[in-house]
Amino acid sequence: MARSLKKGPFADESLLKKVDAMNASGDKSVIKTWSRRSTIFPSFVGHTIAVHDGRKHVPVYVTEDMVGHKLGEFVATRTYRGHGKDEKKSGVR
């Protein structure tokens, strides 16, 4: 279900402060965040944000196409290890 238009997009306040401070200073270092639910704003474009996947922080470089999406959409939380392989079974049991 989409968020109500009257509420507007959500972004974590601390993340917004960090991005605004970096835009003012011109710094382009990696921003570490746990806020996967934050919406990507146009001011985030060009920054690298390390988003937590439950185990580690995965760096995500934000482009213009990502604006309006959530940070968590670009970092998978589950690791796919493949289906079981057909191993040759020995004849002796």
UniProtKB/Swiss-Prot annotation:
PROSITE patterns: RIBOSOMAL_S19. GO terms for biological process: ribosomal small subunit assembly; translation. One of its GO terms (cellular component) is cytoplasm. Gene3D superfamilies: 30s Ribosomal Protein S19, Chain A. InterPro entries: Ribosomal_uS19, Ribosomal_uS19_bac-type, Ribosomal_uS19_CS, Ribosomal_uS19_SF. Belongs to the universal ribosomal protein uS19 family. This is Small ribosomal subunit protein uS19. It comes from Agathobacter rectalis (strain ATCC 33656 / DSM 3377 / JCM 17463 / KCTC 5835 / VPI 0990). The gene is rpsS.
